[in-house]
Structures are given as C-alpha cells and as structure tokens.
Design a protein with these regions (language model features):
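N-terminal non-cleavable signal-anchor helices
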Residues: 1-5, 32, 52, 133
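Ser/Thr-rich, Pro/Gly/Ala-heavy low-complexity intrinsically disordered linkers and tails
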Residues: 11-82, 120
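Divalent cation-coordinating acidic motifs and surrounding scaffolds
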Residues: 71-358
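Short, intrinsically disordered low-complexity segments
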Residues: 1-2, 27, 172
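Sec-dependent bacterial lipoprotein signal peptides
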Residues: 1-12, 225
Length: 358
C-alpha cells in the first residue's frame, strides 16, 4: 500500500490537472494483493512480515512441536512502539513575501497527493492542519481584493470584514488571508481555527488557508513557528484560551512545513533556539516531530536559485541541527515539489512508526 501511495503522489505531481479526491481521509485506490503465498513485500517501510523457509502453517506446526517437547518459545524482546496510528498535527508556515504566490500554487498542486499518500497508510487518519501568520499583520490593500468572506464595498483598512486579534498575531492560525494574490476571505473551517476530519472538503479548505498571498510585512517563518507552538497561543500552562487552542495534541506526531524563498535572516534567536522550542512543545521528546523545509538554495553548490550567495541560510542550519532524519530540506526553485513531498511521505511514515505517544 505504501508503494501505491507514493506512485499516486508522483502521478499527481506529473499531472496536476488530474482531480484529487476531496472526501476527508480518502486514499489511493486499493490494489489486490497477489494470491501467491510465497510473495514478499520489498518496501523498506512495510509493516508486514514474511516467514522465511516455510509456510505460516509450517511455522505454527513447528511451534506446537517445540511446545510439546518443553522447548520454550523464542524471546522476541519487548514489543515495538505503538507509532502515531495516523494521529498527526500538520503546521504549515508559508511566507507571504512579494515573490511567493507561484510557490504557494505549487504547494496547492501537490497537497492532495501528499495528504492521500499518508491517509492511505492508516485505518484512522486523524489530523489537525493549520496555516499560520508569518508577519503579524493584516493587509487588505484595495477593497477589490476582498473575496466572498467580506464586503468589497466596505471601507479600508478592513473592507467591512470582521477581524479579531488573532488575524494580526504572528504564529496565530491563518483563517483570513488578506492582500494581493491571497484568498482574501474568512475561510470556512469546522472549528474555526484549523482543519480537522470534521471538514467535509479538506483540500478546498487548505487552499483557502494556504493561499496567504504576497506583499505583506517582512515574513518571519521561524518566529511564526516558535510562536505557533508556544503555551501562550496554545492556551496551555496557565494561559487563557489562545488563537491556536487545541491544535497541538500530546499524543500526536507534529509535522512542521516551512516554505519561503528567503534565508529568514530576520527571525529572532539562533537556530538552536528553534529546535529547543519544538522539543519543549512536545514535552522534551525530540522524536515527536518531523520538519520539512523548502527554501532558497543559493547557499549551496550547485544551486537552482539565482547567483551563489555565501551568507548563512539559518533555515538550513536549523535542519542540520535536528536529530538525524528529523529534518528534510529542498529547493524553492524546483519546478515540481512532487519529488520533495514523495520523500517527505517516507520521512513522516518512518517518524510515525518510531513514535511513542505521550
């Protein structure tokens, strides 16, 4: 099934015009298993097992014979971790810099296949999906940008929209993207803050919250990530209910996706502090999260993005500081995000398999 899911991801990446399933939890079409009992699954991420040197009934007969002669059964050690069991919190941190609109569309093209590839691996795919503010501002500009969720005949600066404090708080749930090339409306979310399995069409809803537009303030992706998982915005440890109340669950795997075409030189603190913030949000468990970063590659050789720039890309430093395998980084200048997210599916599944819920 895992291989089928990845093939579906690749197929959609190559054929963006193919419509994706829009029902929550829908996965790729199942393919019947071969009838032969001697076949084996060669996928490195398979959760199945194959008994070598005989059939299943032979193995049971052998075990029964050993039991009859007093031979103790083999000790396979303690059971493995339970894994995340499909319970995943997805945090999307998407820059709204002037040049980011095309890259947001690339994400929207691949998201259904990424979602379905993961959904097809679990009997119960229980997700929270949240996009967050990266600049702490709300900029509508012309009222003509205003969509169905607000009154285009209203007056600036809100064009008649009803706003709250969370709409202009960095790291807070983005439910009303505003400005040029954005959704420019209040997104229709079942719980008002992030996508859950109660949302009938997660793909349409994701398109709304992820189309954050371009031309806002200075994007601060790392600051937004740190704020998003802070006790203040989550409303934990003595804080009143926050903008991101209920998003981060103690027993769910956290998957953070950062997409920006800059180095994020403006966010506060060293990259080490960003790692500590994620780990603290998961109660000190450094194995409870996976980070996916798509950023400029001008700091590498070879590179796809413009001229070489030797300045330190702190987002690359951030990924390199994460525990082995917990960070994945790709180039924002790739024409197709499909291969990156295909690798991301494998990384998330590996992290999920090893996860021990708290």
């Amino acid at each position: 099934v895992r291989r089928i899911a990845l093939l579906a991801l690749t197929a959609l990446a190559c054929n963006p015009d193919v419509p994706a399933e829009s029902t929550f939890g829908a996965g790729p079409t199942a393919v019947p298993e071969p009838a032969s009992s001697s076949s084996s699954n060669s996928s490195s991420g398979s959760t199945g097992s194959t008994i070598s040197g005989g059939s299943t009934s032979d193995a049971w007969s052998s075990s029964a014979s050993e039991a009859g002669t007093g031979t103790p059964p083999p000790d396979f050690g303690p059971p493995g971790p339970a894994g995340c069991l499909g319970k995943i919190d997805f945090l999307f941190v998407i820059s709204n810099a002037n040049t980011m609109a095309p890259h947001q569309q690339q994400l929207l093209t691949i998201f259904p296949a990424f979602y379905n590839a993961l959904a097809g691996e679990f009997a119960d795919f229980d997700v929270h999906i949240m996009s967050v503010e990266t600049d702490g501002g709300w900029f509508m500009g012309e009222c003509s940008f205003c969509g169905d969720g607000c009154n285009p005949n209203g007056t600036l600066p809100t064009c008649g929209a009803v706003l709250d404090e969370c709409d202009s708080t960095i790291g807070a749930r983005a439910t009303f993207p505003a400005g040029k090339e954005s959704s420019a409306r209040r997104c229709d979310l079942a719980n008002g803050r992030y996508i859950t399995r109660e949302d009938a069409d997660p793909f349409a809803t994701f398109e709304c919250i992820a189309t954050v537009g371009s031309g806002g303030g200075i994007p601060l992706p790392a600051d937004a990530m740190v704020a998003a998982v802070s006790d203040k915005l989550l409303g934990k440890n003595g804080y009143p209910p926050g903008c991101n109340q209920g998003f981060l669950r103690d027993d769910a795997l956290l998957v953070v996706t950062i997409i920006t075409d800059g180095y994020d030189s403006e966010s506060s603190g060293p990259a080490e502090a960003w790692v500590k913030a994620l780990t603290a949000a998961k109660h000190g468990d450094g194995s409870a999260y996976q980070v996916l970063v798509i950023t400029s590659d001008r700091d590498t050789v070879p590179h796809l993005c413009g001229d070489y720039s030797p300045a330190v890309n702190r987002l690359r430093t951030f990924v390199e500081l994460l525990p082995d395998g917990h960070g994945l980084i790709g180039s924002i200048c790739e024409n197709d995000f499909g291969p990156f997210f295909e690798t991301a599916v494998e990384a998330v599944l590996e992290r999920c398999d090893a996860y021990v819920p708290q």
